[in-house]
Structures are given as C-alpha cells and as structure tokens.
C-alpha cells in the first residue's frame, strides 16, 4: 500500500518546495524504496501548454506527452521514476472532468459543489497517480492562505484522515527571515503560517525552515514549541551553492528516518554515493567554457530550466564549469554577431513566434561559418535549416510558414499528419486549437550510421521527447541535402526529419526533439555531453 507525504508551503512563494520534496524523494529512493511524486497546481488553465514561458517558466514534457509544470523536471532529475500525465494536474483539469461528468448525468441530478465533488476528484487523481509505489510525495502549488489552493488543501486533509496517520505525513516549508538590523532570525512568520495550516485541519509533521544560514538550536526549539512539531522534525535548510547538496543536508538531519519510522518501513540505509560523485565533479572542474544560449525568453531563466540544467550536467561529465550566457535573439539582430565572438559554443533552444527569429538565424550562420560548435533544439533545428537553405542551397528568402506563409521556399511547414508513439495517426490543420495539439511525448527516432549524432548516442534507435507542430518540408529536403546538409535521423515512418548535421563542421547538430528533458545530473545526456566537450576543444584551440 502506498504511503503519502503531502508538501505545502507558507509565508512566501518560490521557497523551493519542489527541490526540497525531490531531495527527500532521492534519499528515500537511495534507501531502496519505490518513490513517485505529484504536483497539484491551483491555476485554472487546463495545463501550462499555452502559458507564457516568461510568466510560468518552461513547459516540461513527459514520455507520454503531457505538458506539465517545470517541477516535474526537478522530480525526474532527482529520482529514476519517469513522470506521466498522472503526476501533474490543475484546477482547470479537475473542473473540466467534473463538469464533463455532470453533463453526462453521472451525478444523478445532484448539486455539484466544491465539497465533495471537486475534492473527491482531486483525491481520485492523487490515489491514481500514487498507485504502485512505496511512497508518493504530493506537492501542492502556491502558498497556504491562497484562495486558489483551498480545494487542494481540503482534499489532502481528507485523504490524510482516510488513509490514517500510519500512511500519511504532512511536510510544510516556510521562510525564516534574517533581519540584518538586529542580527536575528524571525520565527513569527513560520508560527503564523503553521497556525493558518492548522486552522484548516492540517497539523504538519515535518517543518522545513528555509533561511540564509543554519538555524540555531534555540530557534529550532522555539519553532517546535509554538507549532506543536517535534524538535527533531524541525529541519533547517539553509541556502546552498548547489541544489544537489540538499539530499545530503536533509539526510544529515534525519529527515528520511522520520519518514521510515512513521510508516514502519523496512529498508536499507541511504546510499548517496552517486550524489557524492556529482558533487565531486561539480567542485573539481579542470577548466571552464562559455556557451551562449540565443533565446527570446531570456528575462526569466526558468523559461529554459531543463536546458540550463542539461548544460550543467554535461559540464559535470566533462569536468568543466559551464558559464551560460543568455542572449536575447533580438540583441543579435540589433547589435550584430560580434556579441557572439567570445563564446565557445552556441545553443539555440525551442520557442514559438516570429519575434527575434532573424537573430537566431544569424547565430546559426555565425556558428556554421566560424566553425563554432552548435546545438539546435526544436526551433533551433528549424532556424539552422532556414539559414542553410538561404545561404548555402541558394533558396533566397527561404523560411518557415510559421513566420512567412508566403515564402517562396517553405523549408519548414505545419505537420498535417503523423504517427504518434502508440501508432495512431494524428491529423492537424491551421485552424486546430493551440492547446494539446502538438506532436508531443517520446517518439522513436532512427539514426543514420556513420553520422556524428549516431556516434554521440552509440545506437541506431533512440527515444526522445517532442513538442512541436512544424517540421522540415520533405518537398525541399533533397535540394537542401544536395547542398551538403546531412539528414542524420528520421521518424519511425521515415516521413519526418528528426536530426540534421553538417558533415564538414567540427560539431554542428540540430534535433527536432528536446534532449534536455531526459538529462540528469547522475547520467547526463549524450548530445549535451558531446556538445560541451566540443566547446571545451574549441576553447583550447581558439581562446
């Protein structure tokens, strides 16, 4: 039977509930337990798929094609369990399902209310997502006291009561601010946050106190006294220079043992040796490289969270410190490619819309002509293709129909039909809804032997996650290949181009998929590892 740990946050948002929860999950997994994680998001959007990356951060895509909160990326980077569409749902998704059932008549004429109908649907989804694991860690988005969070908090209160104290724990994350003027930390915000939580019927079993420095024992005891939490269950979580230090920090304070004792689980001591190797590599680099990420959402780094992390993971594998320079593609348009001259490699990530596209195309051209290592992801592949078509294949004004519907050379166009991972034919048109209509999730890709990308993966068949609605136009593919661009990966039905590369370039690879979603600190990812290695080589030879 599954045991539940419900995670809530108080005082302020952005305290790192997802990181703290994932770190606890990593320790429990290191003890031999099977662990999964769920994120409950209080916003009314059905999913984050159509939300602005500048507001919400990146959209993380799972193997089964769910467009989810970026916290699921943290979960997959900390534990081996792969997330699915069951691991993240929103208020909008819950209401959509309840209203659908009401229209069908499933409720037999009852008046539909938040309690019990909405809360029952939340509980059903939590139980379904947790099924089959020793422990499920359930994170509730937002902050205690938010109006939007109330149905979720009520649902987890009910579920905790229904499964019993032997199978449910509540973990609350709060801020303990430091006041420089008095030289003191202040516990009052934490006391009030717990008071708010208790007013709705939830007594936390573990308090994780975020602070600038380690909390003195006297302050931990004071918090324990006023919140009715055991002294040993008040965990101090100070700021650290690497999030991968947090599992060891929590284990040192016995957090995993609190969970094991509460649930009566028999398991081994946690083996964190893999995390120790990660920290050693992070602390002992042999050199550093400068990689430019040419994007359009650079004002919010979380918009490219998984790409940032994947580059860091590749740095660990190469024992290199990766300095990531987020460069607005519109700056490349206005200031020219001279702003790229000090870079050791260039990465163009995914994105949508015409704004800044010419800057990305210029960056791809700069990388090609100056033999700078280049990695294109999704849109990054499309701009590389457009650039090559224009400047090498002689297709003047070549473009994507997304940006110029009247282009004389539509080298990239809307995918109108494709086979999904289950073998089902999907059809789209220009008038299809934006939400949930892209080619999504893990897809099989066949790599061409003898290519650089085949060398990187060491395999002819790979699975990578996708999120796009535009693809290479096969009607112009032969003409571009004849000019020297190599198609090095194709979809299962051979109809969609998945990877391209330039054979006479030291390292120029671009893929329609998103390899960043499967990179982890312990394993890295072959494409990113190869890319950062190429950056290191370029740096030695040119800088």
From Swiss-Prot:
Allosterically activated by GTP, when glutamine is the substrate; GTP has no effect on the reaction when ammonia is the substrate. The allosteric effector GTP functions by stabilizing the protein conformation that binds the tetrahedral intermediate(s) formed during glutamine hydrolysis. Inhibited by the product CTP, via allosteric rather than competitive inhibition. Keywords: ATP-binding, Glutamine amidotransferase, Ligase, Magnesium, Metal-binding, Nucleotide-binding, Pyrimidine biosynthesis. Coiled coil: none annotated. The active site is at 378 (nucleophile), 514, 516. The keyword Thylakoid does not apply. It holds the Pfam family CTP_synth_N. ATP binds at residues 14-19, 71, 238-240. Pathway: Pyrimidine metabolism; CTP biosynthesis via de novo pathway; CTP from UDP: step 2/2. InterPro entries: Class_I_gatase-like, CTP_synthase, CTP_synthase_N, GATASE, GATase1_CTP_Synthase, P-loop_NTPase. One of its GO terms (biological process) is 'de novo' CTP biosynthetic process. Its EC number is 6.3.4.2. CTPSs have evolved a hybrid strategy for distinguishing between UTP and CTP. The overlapping regions of the product feedback inhibitory and substrate sites recognize a common feature in both compounds, the triphosphate moiety. To differentiate isosteric substrate and product pyrimidine rings, an additional pocket far from the expected kinase/ligase catalytic site, specifically recognizes the cytosine and ribose portions of the product inhibitor. Catalyzes the ATP-dependent amination of UTP to CTP with either L-glutamine or ammonia as the source of nitrogen. Regulates intracellular CTP levels through interactions with the four ribonucleotide triphosphates. The gene is pyrG. Residues 1-265 are annotated as: Amidoligase domain. GO terms for molecular function: ATP binding; CTP synthase activity; glutaminase activity; identical protein binding; metal ion binding. Homotetramer. Belongs to the CTP synthase family. Residues 290-541 form the Glutamine amidotransferase type-1 domain. Mg(2+) binds at residues 71, 139. This is CTP synthase. GO terms for cellular component: cytosol. CTP binds at residues 13, 146-148, 186-191, 222. CDD domains: CTPS_N, GATase1_CTP_Synthase. UTP binds at residues 13, 186-191, 222. L-glutamine binds at residues 351, 379-382, 402, 469. It catalyses: UTP + L-glutamine + ATP + H2O = CTP + L-glutamate + ADP + phosphate + 2 H(+); L-glutamine + H2O = L-glutamate + NH4(+); UTP + NH4(+) + ATP = CTP + ADP + phosphate + 2 H(+).
């Amino acid at each position: 039977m599954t045991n539940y740990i419900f995670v809530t946050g108080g005082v302020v948002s952005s305290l790192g509930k997802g990181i703290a929860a994932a770190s606890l999950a990593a320790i429990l997994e290191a003890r031999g337990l099977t662990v999964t994680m769920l994120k409950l998001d209080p916003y009314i959007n059905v999913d984050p798929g159509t939300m602005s990356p500048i507001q919400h951060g990146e959209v993380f895509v799972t193997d089964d094609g769910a467009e989810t909160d970026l916290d699921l990326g943290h979960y997959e980077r900390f534990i081996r369990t792969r997330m699915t569409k069951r691991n993240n749902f929103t208020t909008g998704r819950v209401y959509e399902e309840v209203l659908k059932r009401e229209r069908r008549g499933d409720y037999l004429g009852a008046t539909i209310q938040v309690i019990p109908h909405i809360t029952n649907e939340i509980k059903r989804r939590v139980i379904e997502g947790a099924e089959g694991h020793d422990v499920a860690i359930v994170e509730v988005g937002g902050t205690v006291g938010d109006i939007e969070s109330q149905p979720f908090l009520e649902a987890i209160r009910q579920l905790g009561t229904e499964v019993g104290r032997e199978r449910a724990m509540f973990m609350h994350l709060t801020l303990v601010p430091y006041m420089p003027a008095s030289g003191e930390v202040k516990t009052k915000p934490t006391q009030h946050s717990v008071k708010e939580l208790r007013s709705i019927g939830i007594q936390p079993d573990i308090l994780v106190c975020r602070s600038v420095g380690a909390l003195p024992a006297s302050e931990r005891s004071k918090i324990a006294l006023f919140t009715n939490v055991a002294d040993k269950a008040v965990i101090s979580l100070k700021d650290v220079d690497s999030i991968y230090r947090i599992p060891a920090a929590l284990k040192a304070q016995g957090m995993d043992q609190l969970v094991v004792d509460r649930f009566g689980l028999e398991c081994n001591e946690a083996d964190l040796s893999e995390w120790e190797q990660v920290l050693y590599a992070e602390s002992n680099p042999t050199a550093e490289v400068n990689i430019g990420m040419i994007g359009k959402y650079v004002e919010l780094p979380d918009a490219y969270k998984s790409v940032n992390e994947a580059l860091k993971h590749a740095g660990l594998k190469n024992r290199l410190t990766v300095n990531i320079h987020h460069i607005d593609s519109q700056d490349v348009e206005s200031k020219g490619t001279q702003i790229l001259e000090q870079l050791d490699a260039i990465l163009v990530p995914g994105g949508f819309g015409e704004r800044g596209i010419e800057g990305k195309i210029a960056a791809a051209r700069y990388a090609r002509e100056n033999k700078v290592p280049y990695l294109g992801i999704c849109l990054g592949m499309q701009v590389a293709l457009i650039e090559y078509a224009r400047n090498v294949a002689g297709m003047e004004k070549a473009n994507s129909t997304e940006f110029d519907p009247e282009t004389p050379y539509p080298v990239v166009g809307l995918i109108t039909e494709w086979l999904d991972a289950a073998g089902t034919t999907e059809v789209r048109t220009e008038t299809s809804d934006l939400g949930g209509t892209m080619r999504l999730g893990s897809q099989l890709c066949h790599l061409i032997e003898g290519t650089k990308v085949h060398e990187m993966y060491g395999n002819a068949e790979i699975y990578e996650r996708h999120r796009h609605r535009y693809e290479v136009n096969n009607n112009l593919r032969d003409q571009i290949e004849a000019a020297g661009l190599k198609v090095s990966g194709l979809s299962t039905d051979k109809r969609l181009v998945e990877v391209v590369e330039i054979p006479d370039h030291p390292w120029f690879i671009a893929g329609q998929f998103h390899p960043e979603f499967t990179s982890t600190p312990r394993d890295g990812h072959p494409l990113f590892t190869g890319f950062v290695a190429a950056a290191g080589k370029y740096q030695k030879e040119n800088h």
